[in-house]
């Protein structure tokens, strides 16, 4: 059998039935074509014979007639033979063409044979196994017989065990006794050791207390020493400055005397010359006069020479005293430093002892409180407020000295004014050397303050300038301050940078106007008339062209290697992370594109014009001095706020600075009092005391402005008033030999901290590095009220600063547009409220603003970690205010620095900048960006963090930039310095060094949550649920409220959620619905639905991830049914349940995607819908919400108050949203029209009559129902859309169900149409008719609109087909006009648009096999076909094979029986349906033509 099946299989495989069928098809086609040709040729032959008969003579015809007749008979015989052969071929062809290929069946049969053979083998194997089992049974019986012996052996074993047990018990008793004795001994020893350790502990505690007291004493001694040291250094510095000023004045007097002596000598020579002339004219009478004049001139000259000698002695004496003072101060400084080192060493020892014995933080807090407590009484203050009494005391002490100070200042100005007037008379060529840019009285009092930072920028602080510097500038009427106006900080910085570029060239060119004086003090220099006259660019303009020309003319002759210069500049820019835009703006005065072009493709020197050479001159000057690069780097850091470390301090820094200014002024006055005699009268002193106070207040004001600019640029732009022009004037000198006297900057002295390394203070703003730690600890360590309490004297100064801060600063104006948001009156009010409220809060305003999402301790730790977070771009990124507590938070009060109205848009968040150390770690490594982004994406997905939050909190980028960077990361080598920063931040974030606040944290409870579902709220995901539909406000990322459910309930419901196939939810029945009249807590509280209850184990994202596959179509259908049945709107459902807008909900319900095509974020609304459907009280809660909304609307509608806010009810019911869109309540939303049921019914009836009503019908409906015409129009539009969507979803479902259950039998192969588009199925498009399994035709046709869906589910499976898509399927051959050229037995739908088309004839039974083909072909059922039947739509092309003709049906049934016999799957036969369909169409055409040719009678006889 197997051999027979195998040989059969091989035979049929070789036979290749399909190839044979193809060959038969080709032969049949050839035969059909030949028949047509033979018919034509026969006609031609007959016509030729007729013509031959007509044209030839009769005798010839008689001769040829027998031959022609024999030919005709032969042709007839041949044609008859060919017809019989064709008929025989046709019968064979008909039988063979539909024969299924038996190869698969034979193959299956062969496999079944193999299986049967294997069954036989298994049976024999079974027999063998049975035999072996019997043998084993026998062996088992033998083993049972041996059990008796085993029992005996067990009894013996039991006896042995009992003996062993008794022996073990005796041994155990002995051992127990021994152990008890040992234990008693050990317990005794332990007690002794415990006593000794307690005594030692007491001794250690005693020692610790003594050490702590010693440490405190040493700290206080060290503190006192530092203060003494600071006072002595400042006093010495003041003395040195006084001596220097005296020395310079003496020099000036000496020079004036020399000039007067020269003038006298000239007068003497001229007098001599005139005397000689006069002697010639009249000698005798004028001899006495000449003697007299000569003697008087000589006397005057001698007096002047004596005065010069006296002045020279004074100068020498002053220089000697100066050197002696220097030596004394140096020795004192060295002694103090030795003492300081000794104290530091003892302090280190004590700290090492204390390190292992006490908690560092506690000790630190105690020491800081002790420090603050000891500082107040040491300065003479007794009240709680440590700064205010000190200021008052200092002002009282200084009030008596201010009048003397003013008179001294007037005398100084008189002296310097006379010197200026005399100096003006001299020719400019007589002045020796380049002149300093400031007059001697304006020299700094403290040489420590005149030292510029190592980066080339200067302290932007009036604390470094003497008091008379400001007052002389303010009081001197000769200074042209009024003409300068307001100036840009950019231009000041540009001048500051340009100074070092051009100063050398200026000096070489002999220019007398230096931008900055770079050399040390000159002992013989004469003061310039005015500091502003010496700097031509002081008004904020760039250096004049003459200056740059003079700078360029120096190196005009030399050849410059442009490529090398460009390479060096690029290296320096990359090394210091300086952008080309900044470099071009400040150095070259060009745009970024021009700079990039110059650096990328530098032209050779000889090809450049004069103007083209100028950038290279500037670049060379830029590279010549390291200070230029450092200055530019500080500007870059200030503009970007990234790399340079920022020093932060609270507002107490400004008070400390004012205090130090007043102390310094006091000491200076004392020094001046002792050094110089008082030359002013009492009237002058009384008249000028007010001026002195005003100058001090103005100086304090400038100090505060500088402090604000340095320490809080993100909160308030720092205005620079006109008198501050001189701050950045060429006055602060670089390091000189005299700068070694003091090593402490003044702010560091006042804050009792040693200065840090110079690299730490690269900012150009006035902040010492030592401020950093003090500022960080200030909010937690200072006593309440001490941090921000403003002294009464200084409060008007601060108010004045606030009022003056509305000027448009080009530096900070583009950075902080949102901050200038309050009026001036509000600022002053806020300042007063802050002054009183700060005593309660105990922390500074900027810090309060930043403590939003974290607690106070977390905030302090965060800002300790980021000391440089304050930058021009740092805009307090955590300003997201949450829920009900928003109105009570202190940061909601208007900021004192915001001058206009608060804007609704929140401040753009920024990230804390990176430190240089973090840059250096990764900047020069090779980082694999692809792997890094992969890890970041994994971590984001694992923690459920959306890219928007990650970009805002970690990278400082938008969501689009983050998405682009994560999907297409560039290689590390192709990234610029700025482009590498996000990847460095990603690496730091992965390492846990950055942005730890971004990870999901548990939301904090804000209020009672009434009905909630037990799944977790992830605060970070809140803004990410519907980023397309919800406005991205800060409230969307606020922490979520927690549910008051117990944890056991939560865990229980969570486990149920996980176990159920579709997640269900338990509701908390604890709360009661709130009163509908409750207004929202605050004006700005968003009307967001209540989020899911917080639980630390499971979030909604995890619920989505764990959820099994949901039927999205089924869920949306059920939701729509529930909403429609209960007359609930999609807006209410979306806002309350899904947290989406009405448009998003409508789109979601109309076109739900399959579950497997949705992302995690896209699945979330469906999970929420499923949870809502599983809630038994879902409808009631939504109805409650709807009623409350309606009540609120009615209240608003009937209330006459114009400014009343909409009273939105608090959300009741289960809320499954996290990122709900906050609705701003100050905008009244247009009320939603709710129709009554009877109105809906009337509109539905009108719709059934006319889906597209005319305007007249609409107006009639509106008047009948008492509605607006717009409402009626909208209802018709919405209803049409709804029906269209329902039809669309049902068609999709019917298509999927029909494909799943399709069988291969011809009766079940009804054509399924492709789903139409949304508009096609409704608006006047005919539906294609589909064939039911019974062969009946059900024609569904929508008349001019979407019909009411009232059919049974079986009817709903019928799909619609657009009429415009139906295309004619061309025949294989034959004329297009043939109506009968198709399969005769095939069912056809009526043509479109013909109502009276004949119904198609059901399939007839197949005729007998022996019946003649001609008679079967001429059956009446096959004669005609309805017009248009040749057309087949796209649905037919894509569907299964329709019922074919009767002869083709019989062989088509055989494979189905074979399949049922051998168990082939039904889908196997359906695979080649399209091929079979094409083949059947071709076959029908050919067979019909052959049968027609075979059955045709010869119409014309032969002529012969």
Curated annotation (Swiss-Prot):
Gene (name only): Cux1
Biased composition (Low complexity): 525-555, 759-770, 1034-1050, 1080-1093, 1302-1317, 1395-1457
GO cellular component: cytoplasm; Golgi membrane; neuron projection; nucleus
Protein name: Homeobox protein cut-like 1
Main location: nucleus
InterPro entries associated with the record: CUT_dom, HD, Homeobox_CS, Homeodomain-like_sf, Lambda_DNA-bd_dom_sf
Residue stretches of biased makeup (Pro residues): 433-443
Biased composition (Polar residues): 404-416, 447-458, 679-689, 842-857, 871-895, 1020-1033, 1051-1066
Taxonomic placement: Eukaryota, Metazoa, Chordata, Craniata, Vertebrata
Coiled coil: 67-359
Comp. bias (Acidic residues): 1320-1332
Molecular-function GO term, any one: protein-macromolecule adaptor activity
Family from the record: Belongs to the CUT homeobox family.
Record text on subunit structure and interactions: Interacts with BANP. Interacts with SATB1 (via DNA-binding domains); the interaction inhibits the attachment of both proteins to DNA.
Keyword Coiled coil: yes
Localisation: Nucleus
Bias (Basic and acidic residues): 817-841, 1354-1367
């Amino acid at each position: 059998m197997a051999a027979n099946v195998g040989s059969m299989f091989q035979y049929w495989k070789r036979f290749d039935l399909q190839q044979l069928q193809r060959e038969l098809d080709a032969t049949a086609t050839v035969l059909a074509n030949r028949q047509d040709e033979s018919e034509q040729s026969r006609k031609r032959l007959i016509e030729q014979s007729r013509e031959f008969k007509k044209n030839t003579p009769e005798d010839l015809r008689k001769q040829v007639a027998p031959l022609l007749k024999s030919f005709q008979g032969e042709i007839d015989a041949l044609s008859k033979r060919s017809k019989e052969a064709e008929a025989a071929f046709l019968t064979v062809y008909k039988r063979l063409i539909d024969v299924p290929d038996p190869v698969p069946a034979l193959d299956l049969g062969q496999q079944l044979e193999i299986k049967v053979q294997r069954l036989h083998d298994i049976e024999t194997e079974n027999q063998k196994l049975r035999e072996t089992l019997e043998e084993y049974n026998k062996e088992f019986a033998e083993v049972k017989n041996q059990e008796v012996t085993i029992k005996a052996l067990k009894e013996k074993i039991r006896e042995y065990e009992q003996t062993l047990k008794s022996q073990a018990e005796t041994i155990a008793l002995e051992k127990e006794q021994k152990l008890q004795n040992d234990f008693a001994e050990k317990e005794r020893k332990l007690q002794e050791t415990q006593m000794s350790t307690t005594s030692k502990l007491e001794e250690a505690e005693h020692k610790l207390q003594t050490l702590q007291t010693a440490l405190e004493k040493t700290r206080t001694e060290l503190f006192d020493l530092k203060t003494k040291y600071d006072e002595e250094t400042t006093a010495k510095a003041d003395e040195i400055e006084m001596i220097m000023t005296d020395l310079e004045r003496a020099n000036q007097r000496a020079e004036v005397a020399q000039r007067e002596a020269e003038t006298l000598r000239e007068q003497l020579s001229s007098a001599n010359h005139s005397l000689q002339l006069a002697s010639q004219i009249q000698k005798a009478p004028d001899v006495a006069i000449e003697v007299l004049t000569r003697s008087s001139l000589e006397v005057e000259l001698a007096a002047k020479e004596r005065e010069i000698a006296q002045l020279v002695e004074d100068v020498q004496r002053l220089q000697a005293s100066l050197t002696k003072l220097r030596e004394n101060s140096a020795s004192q400084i060295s002694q103090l430093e030795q003492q300081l080192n000794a104290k530091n060493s003892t302090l280190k020892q004590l700290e090492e002892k204390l390190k292992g014995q006490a908690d560092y933080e506690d000790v630190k807090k105690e020491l800081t409180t002790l420090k603050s407590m000891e500082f107040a009484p040491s300065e003479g203050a007794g009240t709680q407020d440590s700064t205010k009494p000190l200021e008052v005391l200092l002002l009282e002490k200084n009030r008596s000295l201010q009048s003397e100070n003013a008179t001294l200042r007037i005398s100084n100005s008189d002296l310097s004014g006379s010197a200026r007037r005399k100096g003006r008379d001299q020719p400019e060529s007589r002045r020796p050397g380049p002149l300093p840019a400031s007059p001697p009285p304006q020299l700094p009092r403290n040489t420590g303050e005149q030292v510029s930072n190592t980066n080339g920028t200067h302290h932007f602080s009036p604390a470094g300038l003497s008091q008379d510097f400001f007052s002389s500038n303010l009081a001197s009427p000769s200074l042209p301050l009024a003409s300068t106006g307001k100036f840009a900080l950019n231009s000041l910085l540009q001048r500051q940078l340009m100074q070092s570029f051009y100063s050398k060239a200026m000096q070489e060119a002999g220019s007398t106007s230096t931008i900055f004086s770079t050399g040390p003090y000159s002992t013989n220099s004469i003061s310039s008339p005015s500091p502003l006259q010496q700097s031509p660019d002081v008004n904020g303009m760039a250096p004049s062209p003459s200056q740059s020309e003079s700078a360029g003319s120096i190196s005009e002759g030399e050849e410059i290697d442009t490529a090398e210069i460009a390479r060096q500049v690029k290296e320096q820019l990359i090394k210091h992370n300086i952008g080309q835009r900044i470099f071009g703006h400040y150095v070259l005065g060009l745009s970024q594109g021009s700079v990039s072009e110059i650096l990328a493709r530098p032209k050779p020197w000889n090809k450049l014009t004069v103007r083209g050479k100028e950038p290279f001159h500037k670049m060379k000057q830029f590279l010549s001095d390291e200070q230029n690069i450092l200055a530019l780097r500080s500007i870059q850091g200030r503009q970007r706020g990234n790399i340079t470390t920022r020093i932060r301090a609270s507002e107490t820094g400004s008070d400390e600075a004012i205090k130090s200014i007043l102390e310094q002024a006091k000491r200076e006055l004392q020094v001046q009092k002792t050094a110089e005699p008082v030359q002013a009268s009492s009237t002058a002193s009384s008249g000028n005391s007010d001026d002195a106070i005003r100058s001090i207040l103005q100086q304090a004001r400038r100090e505060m402005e500088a402090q604000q600019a340095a320490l809080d640029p993100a909160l308030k732009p720092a205005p620079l008033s006109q008198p501050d022009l001189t701050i950045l004037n060429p006055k602060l000198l670089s390091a000189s030999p005299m700068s070694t006297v003091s090593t402490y900057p003044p702010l560091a002295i006042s804050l009792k901290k040693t200065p840090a390394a110079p690299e730490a203070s690269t900012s150009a703003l006035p902040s010492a590095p030592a401020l950093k730690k003090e500022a960080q600890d200030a909010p937690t360590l200072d006593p309440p009220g001490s941090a921000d309490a403003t002294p009464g004297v200084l409060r008007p100064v601060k108010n004045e600063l606030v009022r003056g801060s509305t000027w448009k600063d080009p530096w900070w104006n583009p950075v902080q547009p949102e901050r200038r948001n309050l009026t001036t009156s509000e600022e002053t009010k806020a300042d007063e409220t802050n002054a009183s409220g700060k005593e309660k809060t105990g922390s500074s305003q900027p810090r309060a603003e930043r403590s939003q999402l974290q607690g106070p301790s977390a905030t302090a730790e965060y800002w300790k970690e980021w000391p440089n977070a304050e930058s021009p771009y740092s805009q307090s990124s955590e300003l997201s205010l949450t829920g009900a507590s928003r109105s009570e938070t202190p940061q909601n009060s208007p900021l004192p620095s915001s001058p206009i109205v608060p804007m609704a848009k929140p401040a753009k968040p920024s990230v804390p900048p990176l430190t240089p150390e973090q840059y250096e770690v990764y900047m020069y490594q090779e980082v694999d960006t692809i792997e890094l982004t992969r890890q970041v994406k994994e971590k984001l997905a694992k923690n459920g963090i959306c890219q928007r939050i990650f970009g805002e909190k970690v990278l400082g980028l938008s969501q689009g930039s983050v998405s682009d960077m994560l999907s297409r990361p560039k290689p590390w080598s192709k990234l610029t310095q700025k482009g590498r920063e996000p990847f460095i931040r990603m690496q730091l974030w992965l390492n846990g060094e950055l942005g730890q606040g971004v990870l999901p944290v548990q939301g904090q409870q804000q209020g009672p949550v009434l009905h909630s579902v037990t799944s977790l709220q992830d605060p970070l995901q809140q803004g990410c649920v519907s980023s397309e539909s919800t406005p991205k406000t800060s409230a969307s990322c606020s922490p979520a409220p927690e549910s008051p459910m117990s944890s056991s309930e939560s865990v229980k419901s969570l486990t149920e959620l996980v176990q159920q196939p579709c997640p269900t939810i338990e509701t908390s029945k604890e709360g009661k619905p709130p009163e509908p009249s409750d207004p929202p807590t605050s004006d700005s509280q968003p009307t967001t639905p209540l989020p899911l209850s917080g639980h630390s184990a499971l979030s909604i994202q995890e619920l989505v991830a764990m959820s099994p596959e949901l039927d999205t179509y089924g869920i949306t259908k059920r939701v729509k049914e529930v909403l429609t049945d209960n007359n609930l709107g999609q807006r209410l459902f979306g806002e309350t349940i899904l947290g989406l807008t009405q448009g998003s909900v409508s789109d979601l319900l109309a076109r739900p995607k399959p579950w497997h095509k949705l992302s995690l974020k896209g699945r979330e609304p469906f999970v929420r819908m499923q949870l809502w459907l599983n809630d038994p009280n879902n409808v009631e809660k939504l109805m409650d919400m709807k009623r409350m909304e309606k009540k609120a609307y009615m209240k608003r509608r009937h209330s006459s108050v114009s400014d009343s806010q909409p009273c939105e009810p608090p959300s009741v019911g289960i809320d499954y949203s996290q990122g709900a869109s906050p609705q701003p309540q100050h905008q009244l939303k247009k009320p939603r029209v709710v129709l009554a049921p009877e109105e809906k019914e009337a509109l539905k009836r009108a719709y059934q009559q006319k889906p597209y009503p005319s305007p007249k019908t609409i107006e009639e409906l509106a008047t009948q129902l008492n509605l607006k015409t717009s409402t009626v129009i909208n209802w018709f539009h919405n209803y049409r859309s709804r029906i269209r969507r329902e039809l669309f979803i049902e068609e999709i479902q019917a298509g999927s169900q029909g494909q799943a259950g399709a069988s291969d039998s011809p009766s079940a192969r009804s054509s399924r149409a492709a789903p139409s588009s949304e508009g096609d199925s409704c608006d006047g498009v005919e539906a294609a008719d589909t064939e039911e399994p019974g062969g009946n035709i059900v024609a569904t046709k929508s008349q001019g609109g979407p019909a009411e869906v009232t059919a049974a589910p079986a009817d709903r499976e019928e799909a619609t087909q657009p009429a415009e898509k139906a295309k004619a399927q061309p025949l294989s051959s034959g004329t297009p006009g043939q109506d009968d050229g198709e399969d005769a037995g095939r069912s056809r739908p009526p043509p479109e648009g013909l109502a009276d088309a004949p119904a198609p004839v059901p399939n007839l039974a197949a005729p007998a096999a022996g019946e003649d083909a001609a008679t079967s072909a001429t059956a009446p059922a096959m004669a005609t076909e309805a017009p248009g039947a040749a057309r087949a739509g796209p649905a037919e092309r894509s569907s299964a094979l329709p019922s074919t003709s009767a002869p083709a049906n019989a062989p088509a049934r055989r494979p189905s029986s074979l399949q049922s016999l051998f168990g082939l799957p039904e889908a196997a036969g359906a695979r080649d349906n399209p091929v079979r369909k094409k083949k059947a169409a071709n076959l029908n055409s050919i067979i019909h033509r052959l049968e027609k040719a075979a059955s045709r009678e010869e119409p014309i006889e032969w002529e012969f």
